[in-house]
Amino acid sequence: MQNRSFYVKSYGCQMNVYDSQKITSILESKGLKNKLDPKSADLVIFNTCNIREKAAHKLYSDIGRVNKLGLKKTIAVVGCVAQAENSEMFRKNKSIDIVLGPQSYHLLPKMLDDLENNFKQINTDFIVNEKFDYLSEQMRPQGVSSMVTIQEGCDKFCSFCVVPYTRGPEYSRPIKSISDEVKLLSQKGAKEIVFLGQNVNAYNDKSNNNDAKLSDLIRAISEFDSVKRIRYTTSHPINMDEKLIQEHKII
């Protein structure tokens, strides 16, 4: 995989931006070079969003633009459109080589290796707990304000929303995993931490006999002297409990 290069295009929400940053860190740790232009990259990754109805149409248009460059590229579609359309993507556009759901992007290096056997690669399993184990020490600094995913998925199944089908059921990262990431980010200059989740205030870490809610996580992260501000998005009113409200006054 050495001497290869990649380009990542992100669509949609802040969590996709965060996921693209993690994909970039993982690939760079494997020796790939990040490019700012698809023309100069061997691998083009589209990290997709499926909230809006025309999201897939925009994706296929962008793939068409890459194909018009006339250069052989490995094309990977990751994220929520990949999860929603699954193997159907290969039928719709034969230039797609990899289809990867939003809970499996840590498998991308292995899929690239397997692709050398000339088999198209797909993984849309909901294995969200595994991907957070791949916290690269070479994580790229995000700047003064840094995003950290603490929760994914949703159990609400609102009639207008596709999130439970593309991001899966609610899952909360262990506090230790989040703390380790915040520590790395703070060492790289982060002063503000933005917690991300599809239903962020449904956060509930039950690992290792814990029962930690978002209020407990905020309290734990506030102990980092270098972290001056904590924000979170997106919240749901049904999970806005009194303890969390009081934490806004205390911290």
Model segments located where?
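Proteins enriched for Cys/Gly/acidic motifs involved in redox and nucleic-acid/cofactor modification
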Residues: 1-203, 213, 243
